[in-house]
Amino acid sequence: MDSLSSYWIFIVFLACLPFFSPVDARTDRNSIITPINRDLYHSSVDLMEEIEALVHRHPNKLNIETIESENRGYQAQVAVVTYCRDRKEDDKSKFRILLTFGQHGRELITSELALRILSILSEEEFLPKMDRKSLNNTLDKLIVKVVPMENINGRKRVEDGDLCERRNGRGVDLNRNWSVDWGKKEKDYDPYEENPGSAPFSEPESQIMRKLALSFEPHLWVNVHSGMQALFMPYDHRNTTPDGASSAKMKALVNDLNYRHFQGRCMTGSGGGSVGYLAHGTATDYIYEIAKVPMAFTFEIYGDESAPSKDCFRMFNPTDLTTYKRVLNDWSAAFFTIFKFGPQLLGLAKSEESKLATRCPDQPTVM
């Protein structure tokens, strides 16, 4: 074989090799999708079964009801767990709290937190360094309604492999389906992420939550999410917070929580002013503006900002045991601080209010 023929054979051989570059290697690494850690996280079925068993073990403190709704052939169920000692739910002197978790299917860690809070309320688990006498005094004053998994149909889509799904079982974002500023679209609107539905409250899940909020008339509402670390108050559809005494009390509470439990790591302020985009048709804005709940919040309990955009399980949920435990412990403690000081804030004497402000001066917003 002459040298010219050998040269062309070598060129053809090189052309047949797979093309490789450092850019491709980086892309391959970024395309890795983290699966659900089944050793850490309950399935939706197992989590609800564990909650039901917890309720049955403590009938003097807990009860559970399942509320159903349907719209145009689409059905949804929402389980609501109520904590109230001696089951005196009609006691108007008690501080009423409504907490909802799992509104977005991909945020599994939020429902794990719901289970942890219920376990502490039932006194099967305890927070580190918790004073049990102080806990008893606090719990005597409360009625807490917990929705552990608001969007169970969307959660099942995540468990079936669509790890980035945040919408409900027919593709609507439940946190864009409420009526305050509903349907408005920003320039960066993503229909996959933010589909608001055909009309306000078109979705059974939103209908159930609205009915629950209006009938229960809570003093305090928290919508629990993940994706970042934040303690947000209204508004989501504006880049400002409300005026007045109620707003001042909400600011005092989030500053206290941020200082006490998170060393100032959490973003605070309005959702619309802190996140970098406005959100329209959200639950918390309706709860504050229309339902007139005096203290309404959206908490974001975890986020991995280094995760690639398609690696949603890692982005929204802790993937290792140490971080998982830390998130549940820190946020459980934060909620029990709310349970303790929330009633004081709403019925606060001036001397107590100044003491709270002295204990926790305003912290700078963490951006």
What are these language model-derived features?
Residues 2, 13-35:
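N-terminal signal peptide
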Residues 45, 49-52, 115, 119, ...:
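Solvent-exposed, polar/charged alpha-helical surfaces in well-ordered, non-transmembrane soluble domains
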Residues 207, 211-221, 227-229, 251-278, ...:
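Active-site-adjacent substrate-binding region
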Residues 93-103, 107-248, 300, 307-316:
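Active-site/substrate-binding loop(s) of hydrolase catalytic cores
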Residues 43-95:
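Soluble metallo-hydrolase cores and metallopeptidase-like ectodomains found primarily
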Residues 1-9:
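Bacterial N-terminal signal peptides that target proteins for export
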Residues 50-57, 117-124, 149, 212-216, ...:
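Structured segments of extracytoplasmic/periplasmic soluble domains
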Residues 221, 229-245, 281-359:
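Active-site-adjacent mobile loop/cap segments within catalytic or ligand-binding domains
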